[in-house]
Swiss-Prot record:
Residues 73-290 form the Radical SAM core domain. This is Lipoyl synthase. Its EC number is 2.8.1.8. It holds the Pfam family Radical_SAM. It catalyses: [[Fe-S] cluster scaffold protein carrying a second [4Fe-4S](2+) cluster] + N(6)-octanoyl-L-lysyl-[protein] + 2 oxidized [2Fe-2S]-[ferredoxin] + 2 S-adenosyl-L-methionine + 4 H(+) = [[Fe-S] cluster scaffold protein] + N(6)-[(R)-dihydrolipoyl]-L-lysyl-[protein] + 4 Fe(3+) + 2 hydrogen sulfide + 2 5'-deoxyadenosine + 2 L-methionine + 2 reduced [2Fe-2S]-[ferredoxin]. It comes from Dechloromonas aromatica (strain RCB). It is found in: Cytoplasm. The keyword Iron applies. Pathway: Protein modification; protein lipoylation via endogenous pathway; protein N(6)-(lipoyl)lysine from octanoyl-[acyl-carrier-protein]: step 2/2. [4Fe-4S] cluster 1 binds at C61, C66, C72, S301.
Length: 314
């Protein structure tokens, strides 16, 4: 058994997943529409990175090797990752490390809230690794962080991007009510046919139920979910997931292109043309989503502030 606090990445992380990754001899060449803006150490990008190091805070932007980190940090926005940087799951599309996490840092809520206030962030996204080792899946820590940010920076709009709280959903939903965000996001990630391959340990119906039950309990909070394309799904399967999301009262949507972090992760099965993303966005509007961001470089938290504004949140 791995030692607590030791992070497994790449091949070590994915060695024990149920459906093994089959490496490709020649990865698909990235098309011209996949373009990433590099970060500049000056200005807001450098300011945010410096404060993250000073406060020993984590962002999913860095831990998951998000391609938009330069643009988002440069705009003065970041997605904070709470509850450590070691995940109890082994999802083979994700670059976050796996292992036995350390106990939650009791100082993290205050330190994160102080950073949000100091950086004068108008919109903050708070996410976490999966914490299957905790009785509540980390729900109370989410509440503590939300409350601390509300107190330190009352005008900041808060989006939480939560895990699935597997095996403890009812407890988690009860607890989350003690510190509600403005937007609750939980990513479906992919289509149900690919769950065992891409999301070992997760369950499609459970994730839908989490969002439906949360919305039923807290109807004033907007609900949101995100999908990736390029894992082996079809366009029709994506549309079917979108229908399922609407049937379970999810109001906001993001769809973006999957990019493999390394050769030890799931390979990209296809690069979806921007016109197809436009089709997804048009269909989302027809289905009644209040906000939909669908484009190759879109990620769950990418321009989340503008999407929330268009949905009447911020």
């Amino acid at each position: 058994m791995a030692e607590k606090g030791v992070k497994q990445k790449g091949e070590l992380k994915t060695a024990r997943i149920p459906i093994k990754i089959v490496p490709v001899d020649t990865p698909l060449r990235k098309p011209e529409w996949i373009r990433v803006k590099a970060g500049n150490s000056a200005g807001r990008f450098g300011e945010i990175k410096s404060m993250l190091r000073e406060k020993k805070l984590h962002t999913v932007c860095e831990e998951a090797a998000c391609p938009n980190i330069g643009e988002c940090f440069g705009r003065g926005t970041a997605t904070f990752m709470i509850l450590g940087d070691i995940c109890t799951r082994r999802c083979p599309f994700c670059d976050v490390g796996h292992g036995q996490p350390l106990p939650p840092n009791p100082n993290e809520p205050a330190e994160l809230a102080d950073s949000v206030s100091s950086l004068k962030l108008q919109y903050v996204v708070i996410t976490s690794v999966d914490r299957d080792d905790l009785r509540d899946g980390g729900a109370q820590h989410f509440v503590d962080v939300v409350r601390a940010v509300r107190e330190a920076s009352p005008k900041t709009t808060i989006e939480t991007l939560v895990p699935d709280f597997r095996g403890r959903m009812d407890i988690a939903i009860d607890i989350l009510g003690n510190g509600l965000p403005d937007v609750l996001n939980h990513n479906m990630e992919t289509v149900p046919r690919l769950y065992k391959q891409a999301r070992p340990g997760a369950d499609y119906a459970h994730s839908l139920a989490l969002m439906k039950q949360f919305k039923a309990r807290y109807p004033d909070v907007k609900t949101k979910s995100g999908l990736m394309v390029g894992l082996g799904e079809t366009d029709e399967e994506i549309l079917e997931v979108m229908r399922d999301l609407r049937a379970n009262d999810v109001e906001m949507l993001t769809i973006g292109q999957y990019l493999a972090p390394s050769g030890h992760h799931l390979p990209v099965s296809r690069y979806v043309h921007p016109d197809t993303f436009k089709m997804f966005e048009e269909e989302a509007k027809k289905m009644g989503f209040s906000g939909a961001a669908c484009a190759p470089m879109v990620r769950s938290s990418y321009w989340a502030d503008q999407q929330a504004h268009s949905a009447g949140v911020a």
